[in-house]
Amino acid sequence: MASPSNHSASSLTAEPSGALLGSITVPGDKSISHRALIFGALAVGETRIGGLLEGEDVLATAETMRRLGAEVERHADGTWSVHGVGVGGLKEPDQPLDFGNSGTGARLVMGLVAGHPITATFIGDASLSRRPMGRVIAPLTETGATFHAREGGRLPLTLTGAGRALPITYRLPVASAQVKSAVLLAGLNAPGVTTVIEETPTRDHTERMLRAFGAHIEVEDGPRGLIVIRLTGEPELKPCRISVPGDPSSAAFPVVAALLTPGSEITVTGITLNPHRAGLYTTLMEMGGDIEVMNQREEGGEPVADLRVRASRLKGIEVPPARAASMIDEYPVLAIAAAFAEGETRMLGIHELRVKESDRIAATASGLRANGVKVHESDDGMVVEGRSGEVGGGGHVATHIDHRIAMSFLVMGLAAQKPVTVDDAAMIATSFPNFTGLMRGLGASFVGRAQ
């Protein structure tokens, strides 16, 4: 659905730009930032965090950890410290926990609170309050927690944790790192072993970080391709020093912009290429994208690398549905790349996008059509008809309060024949506070009040 043509106070227009050139560092990984604060709050002692993403979502989690009893402080050098209260030591908050737009923060903290004998009310913005929480509520109820929520398990909801949390064995009905992590967080304060069984691998930042903080966690290959994760409850978590690598989901926007804008060559330094997060980059290379992986290393248990990206002629492909979990947040910007490719790009098995910050399939398809690109939408995916580098642009796109929709179509505007306007760019601050400044530094042109 296109927005009205008059610009709102937070609208932003991306104009066709010259070559994007330079080296950038994107903000710290959002998934790892949330978890660093949460596990720091559960450790005994001081955890130091460098590179924390200071977007609105992560800052909401930091404030939540304070309300649950941890001391969380930002220092002048940009590092953060968390003085934890230990597993089982959370205090009951004296006011609602406000997660803003952050589904990750809300779901992880539900798991955390479910394992403690306290009551907390969870609230969020209009977008988060539309998102279903039932898939988290179901397993946490098995641990002994109780919930009072709006219809469909939506926020605001009140959660009372178990007086004595039960260790459970839970098989994930759909691939979801958030549900997996919520169950493991609840299991931390349960006696015995909590087991999670996955049919499809999902991002494993929680498992990696639990190990780093000293928890006993085992990950094994089970029968018929299943993955079995076992966590021994009631550990004493030890504080850590964590360096948060760059977020591959944020890096996706400058990377795709450089691929699509003629003459571009950029380097993105220090992003995590965790195999459960790198699906977009694999896909772009299969499409013919000139992406060189350099300086591979490991930092804080996470694989990290630099990327050199050069403008490329892309071709359409069929994205394997099994890859969806490793790139679920990147489909909107992949659809932009597909619009400039030669031939069709088929993206199926992504029904999960219907219940993100917006219905991302519908929002992406609508934005593509508004800019002259043909797209065929189905219940669980879309097929984009590429225009071989000749995307008309000129459209006004409704973002539906979704940061990834906003950034994706701003990327389109840099490479299209005419400018592209998004109706609301304010929410970009939830995940990528310096998006416009960083992109301008590479040569991108943006016009509008939302900066």
Curated annotation (Swiss-Prot):
Active site: D329
Entries under CDD domains matching the protein: EPSP_synthase
Catalysis performed (reactions): 3-phosphoshikimate + phosphoenolpyruvate = 5-O-(1-carboxyvinyl)-3-phosphoshikimate + phosphate
Pathways per UniProt: Metabolic intermediate biosynthesis; chorismate biosynthesis; chorismate from D-erythrose 4-phosphate and phosphoenolpyruvate: step 6/7
Domain of life: Bacteria
Binding site for phosphoenolpyruvate: K30, G103, R131, Q178, R360, R404
Keyword annotations of the record: Amino-acid biosynthesis, Aromatic amino acid biosynthesis, Cytoplasm, Transferase
EC number: 2.5.1.19
Main location, first listed in the record: cytoplasm
Binding-site residues, 3-phosphoshikimate: K30, S31, R35, S176, Q178, D329, K356
Family label: Belongs to the EPSP synthase family.
Record's function text: Catalyzes the transfer of the enolpyruvyl moiety of phosphoenolpyruvate (PEP) to the 5-hydroxyl of shikimate-3-phosphate (S3P) to produce enolpyruvyl shikimate-3-phosphate and inorganic phosphate.
Protein name: 3-phosphoshikimate 1-carboxyvinyltransferase
Taxon lineage: Bacteria, Pseudomonadati, Pseudomonadota, Alphaproteobacteria, Hyphomicrobiales
Gene name of the record: aroA
